[in-house]
Amino acid sequence: MNPNARPHIEKILANMTQLPGVYRMLGKDGELLYVGKAKNLKNRVSSYFVKTIEHPKTQALVARIHDIETLVTRSETEALLLEQNLIKQHRPPYNIMLRDDKSYVYIFVSSDKPYPRIASGRGKGKHQIGKFFGPYPSAYSARDTLLVLQKLFNVRQCENSYFAQRKRPCLQYQIKRCSAPCVGLISPEDYKQDVDNSIRFLQGDTKELNQELIAKMEEAAEQLAFEKAMFYRDRLGLLREVQAQQAVFKIKGEADILAIAFQAGVTCVQIMYVRNGRMLGGKSYFPDMLSDDLGQMLSDFIANFYFQVADEVPSELIVNVELPDRKELEQALQTQFDKKIQIKHKVRETRAEWQELAIMNVQHAIKGQLSNHLELNERFHQLEQVVGRPVDRIECFDISHTMGEATIASCVVFDQGGARKRDYRQFGIEDITAGDDYAAMRQALTRRYKKHIVPDLLLIDGGKGQLHMAMEVMQTLGLDAFMVGVSKGEGRKPGLETLHFTDGSKIQLPEDHKALHLIQQVRDEAHRFAITKHRAKRDKRRAGSVLEVIPGLGPKRRRDLLTHFGGIQGVLKASEKELMLVSGLGPSMARTIYKILHE
């Protein structure tokens, strides 16, 4: 406990109620550090200040607490709902469990008539009308399923704007992954059948599809339509190949199976997804927890995950440990998602198979993570020896632009648990001389540390010049930051980097030094993060700049044009009559656009 705050905290604890409710822990400047819920506020909050607390994250939290506020509720369920609402609203740093909190990936079948599209994306976009299937454990697994659907049923996956402006079939048709509805090479009736079959496939109804394909293949063979028979034979082979890879269980229904494991300071939660009796796969999470009790940790994870990250919750959650507040958690989830939800620990038969599979996967995942964890810890340890001070959090900046165009600065964050992707930041750099990397870095550092705490190590991708500029920024902000500049070697060859320190000294580590490997890993991630955003910004700006010279064509109409034709290339290829089809463009403006673009 912070010595300066001890008298105040002890007074608060002495007068605290034993009713259920929510507690908020505040820092020196009143900033919200952590939100928690309790069945008994006095007992729960007091437990943070006992001498036996050993968890590093809890110790770090307690050291920063200067004040505690409480809100009494009528029940523990009400407290849980309020806790999750406050976390969602304020995002306190010590409530952050997941380093990467991307939402679920779904496959989406649109309701566009007469030619729906199939695509994948994160979350159930409320602006989209259609059917969603999933969740899928990763974008890769969703794309893999889409590829199978393309090969089986040839349903389009292109954007509506691209679809609308096609005049001839695209490459997808040439490689037999689309039936080219854009140019009328398939009737709406036949296309609808392909869409319906795609939906049946996504719902797991592959047995009937199998029988239908056999019947069509035999019918085509009897009619001596051998090319058609071969087409159905190939589809049948692909479908059977997919069926062989899928785990399909006898019972239908939906469930998430969650297994937790804790070993050597690493917590892992494995989630397996079952929908319509099909195992869709699973994903491993490595949350930062404040507890060492497996049941409490899994309960906290479930509350955080389904309230803060997931778009849906299935009717069953199967867990591998008993949860201390199972009933309250069920009630809170039912209130949030407006459906009956059961959390089960002791299960039999098929559900026991699911549970066993999740346990096997969590044990495998934690072994792999421990191996990575040990390697990363060793890299951090060797880096600490090189710089002569403790290092837990590293932040690294990089600048990306093309001849001064669309300049982007990136900031990536690593700690001894790995990359903290939810702490990454990107800065669009404006109002500087084109190509001035020093000014770009100055602006990014100022914007980052005007309100944020400096890390244990600030890595600057650049040599002495960039480092001196960073020192000036920190001096202006009145901050004491430990910084190291990283300059590339001859020919920009990896392994020849030089580290520059603020006292003017510099060192070159051996190519196989683990500290150098860590620095390269962080720097390369900063470069990747910057250049990805830069390219997107540059391409968007270039697409718009061609249209900006057209008088009377404002931002909204430019955006409508690009959306309608699927990009600047589509606009350039469009005729006057096609331009007139864009909403809000009359004959005069269409003529002007065409004339200027084709002069």
UniProtKB/Swiss-Prot annotation:
UniProt cross-references to SMART domains, sorted A to Z: GIYc
CDD domains documented for this protein: GIY-YIG_UvrC_Cho
UniProt xrefs under Pfam families: GIY-YIG, HHH_5, UVR, UvrC_RNaseH, UvrC_RNaseH_dom
SUPFAM superfamilies: C-terminal UvrC-binding domain of UvrB, GIY-YIG endonuclease, RuvA domain 2-like
One annotated Gene Ontology cellular component of this protein: excinuclease repair complex
GO MF: DNA binding; excinuclease ABC activity
UniProt-listed Gene3D superfamilies: 5' to 3' exonuclease, C-terminal subdomain, GIY-YIG endonuclease, UVR domain, UvrC, RNAse H endonuclease domain
One GO BP: nucleotide-excision repair
Major subcellular location class: cytoplasm
GIY-YIG domain segment(s): 18-96
UniProtKB keywords: Cytoplasm, DNA damage, DNA excision, DNA repair, Excision nuclease, SOS response
Family, as annotated: Belongs to the UvrC family.
Biological role stated in the UniProt entry: The UvrABC repair system catalyzes the recognition and processing of DNA lesions. UvrC both incises the 5' and 3' sides of the lesion. The N-terminal half is responsible for the 3' incision and the C-terminal half is responsible for the 5' incision.
Subunit structure as annotated in this protein's UniProt entry: Interacts with UvrB in an incision complex.
Name assigned to this protein: UvrABC system protein C
